[in-house]
Amino acid sequence: MLQTRLFHACAALARAASRPVPKPTSEIPDVSTFLAKIGRQCSEHAELYENKWENLFMWDGPKLKEKGVPVQQRRYILQQVERLRQGGPVREIREGKKSFFGGERKRKEKVAKWRAEQRHAA
């Protein structure tokens, strides 16, 4: 059993180490430019990466957590890094705006209450 666990652990580490690190482009020459381009105030964390391209691609979620990056920005940065690694376009994805009536589950109830309040107010 120990051998099986060791084999799977080594395979996972080898897979993670073999992931390609793309070369900097003229559009995105360094880490600070990348973080500024993806938006959502991620450029605040540029000094954490020490402007090293390898740090951007080698650091994972726990490492960013250790450095003090908030959860939402951490997930967003890792998503954009993976998109760059796969050759996709790097652009800002704006945060969604929450609906006035809340989520899908209680929408009918909230709309009914709101309409009742509107009728009583008028």
Curated annotation (Swiss-Prot):
Q: What domain of life? A: Eukaryota
Q: Where in the cell is it found?
A: Mitochondrion
Q: Name one Pfam family in it.
A: SAM_Ribosomal_mS41
Q: What keywords are annotated for this sequence in UniProt?
A: Mitochondrion, Ribonucleoprotein, Ribosomal protein, Transit peptide
Q: Which GO terms describe its cellular component?
A: mitochondrion; ribonucleoprotein complex; ribosome
Q: Which cysteines are joined by disulfide bonds?
A: none
Which stretches are annotated as coiled coil?
Answer: none
Q: What main location does UniProt list?
A: mitochondrion
From which residue to which does the transit peptide run?
Answer: 1-10
The UniProt entry, under SMART domains, shows:
IGR (SM01238)
Q: Which InterPro entries match?
A: Ribosomal_mS41, SAM_Ribosomal_mS41
What task does this protein carry out?
Involved in telomere length regulation.
What family is this protein classified in?
Belongs to the mitochondrion-specific ribosomal protein mS41 family.
User: What protein is this chain from?
Assistant: Small ribosomal subunit protein mS41
Source organism of the structure? Eremothecium gossypii (strain ATCC 10895 / CBS 109.51 / FGSC 9923 / NRRL Y-1056)
Upper lineage: Eukaryota, Fungi, Dikarya, Ascomycota, Saccharomycotina
